[in-house]
Amino acid sequence: MKRIAVIGGGPAGMLAAAEAAGKGNQVILFEQNEKTGKKLYITGKGRCNLTNACPVEEMFEHIPRNPKFLYSALYGFTNRDIMALVESMGIKLKVERGQRVFPVSDHASDVLKALNAYMQGKGVEVRLHSRVESLKKVQAGFIL
């Protein structure tokens, strides 16, 4: 079992922490704010625009510079994967104009509650109000 620190409690950090913990690692997520996922509330005007339902190939047409840089990321965990994961957390989704994907409830707070429950279920330790001031590489790993 590895000891893993995730710095930043946005949606990406929350999912990274949960996935690492789900693989049997001891995971601590550090978030400087009073709660995780704070910026999720402003996506889609508070409705939580999760992703776009268009084919992955089509997404590259909308990336103005160096789309090849994102190939491995977008093919490694696709928009369909994120939709399936969120639905597995009990959040029903809908696709609107422009292939934009939202929770049926139109509330970002529902997605945030599900993400927090997902992390908790995987055993992630969350430290709020915890700003990481420095990071130092040592032989055994890192010191935060």
Predicted features, each with a name:
Residues 1-2, 23-25, 36, 122, ...:
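Short coil/turn connectors at secondary-structure junctions
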Residues 4-7, 27, 111, 123-124, ...:
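Hydrophobic aliphatic residue packing
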Residues 2-29:
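N-terminal Rossmann-like FAD-binding beta1-loop-alpha1 element of flavoenzymes
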Residues 16-17, 39, 137:
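Short glycine-/acidic-enriched loop or helix-start segments at secondary-structure transitions
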Residues 29-32, 134-136:
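Short linear motifs in intrinsically disordered
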Residues 128-141:
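A conserved short coil-to-beta-strand element within the FAD-binding core of flavoproteins
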Residues 32-125, 130:
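Conserved N-terminal/central alpha/beta ligand/cofactor-binding core
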